[in-house]
């Protein structure tokens, strides 16, 4: 399946299929040099899938740490210095092969190297179906996640679904959070559909039918980012679950999707408090437990610590913390939330696990 962005200019294709890695070769001859930034996990398990690619002249492999630990100033400088030592030109390609963190990091390298070189995304996880599309790239700061970055469109996104076959269950859970988020954004019917399909851990772990929901998620994100590339309006909706989720992820060092799921429950609690929305919190908690999400850490949440991270969220303005909230299905808002409401919501969330 081939999708295409529909910006006024500078569009890029998104290939989503089994065996899609073959499309990388169609781009390599266009560049003076190419650097595959490949995460250590993918290199360990899939190195042979790239044999044909390394038969091309001037293609280099750069192995980087997997996950968020690659998104540091130190790794950024080390990678840039290595690439620059090859006397690169602007007709160079940075090719990100790995999960969402790899794409974020490699994209920031591409955006800043010589003030911008070519960039190809080759996502290898479910989570990266979200992050590889839309052009957000960046690294982390001691103050929080993704606070240093840019908007930088790739030349292409090549999503080979064969990579998903060997994902450990923890990564399936983490990736499913973004798939589920897209269903929530699409409304009550889409949410019921995905919940009925992925009823429990066994079905989710099998990945049966996941291709369809990934494709739908990408289409949902495309519709939003083409309408609002620089996140001035509706693109903020894609941050559903992320204001609280990023704080939990960064402080408790849990997988991104696990934290986003906690953030999704949290925003339902906040919406109930602000709008009397009557979301069934127990339903969502029980659903996540059926899927196998480890939620025990919720009892250890410390609001004051998390609130300091929430204050650094990129959606905020001078009025304070902004959250994406589902007032009702089909009615999504970006709302300022006061500290007391946020604190009470955190306390209420913890009561479900005592």
Swiss-Prot record:
Please indicate which superkingdom the organism of origin belongs to: Bacteria
- Protein residues bound to NAD(+): 100-104, 124-125, 136, 145, 163-166
Query: Pfam families this protein is in?
Result: DHQ_synthase (PF01761), DHQS_C (PF24621)
Q: Where does Zn(2+) bind?
A: 178, 242, 256
Q: Does the keyword Ribosomal protein apply?
A: no
Instruction: Check the record and name the InterPro entries matching this protein.
Output: Dehydroquinate_synthase, DHQ_synth_AroB, DHQ_synth_fam, DHQS/DOIS_N, DHQS_C
Give a Gene Ontology cellular component term annotated to this protein: cytoplasm
Its main localization is: cytoplasm
Similarity remark: Belongs to the sugar phosphate cyclases superfamily. Dehydroquinate synthase family.
- According to its UniProt entry, what is the function of this protein? Catalyzes the conversion of 3-deoxy-D-arabino-heptulosonate 7-phosphate (DAHP) to dehydroquinate (DHQ).
Give the protein's recorded name.
3-dehydroquinate synthase
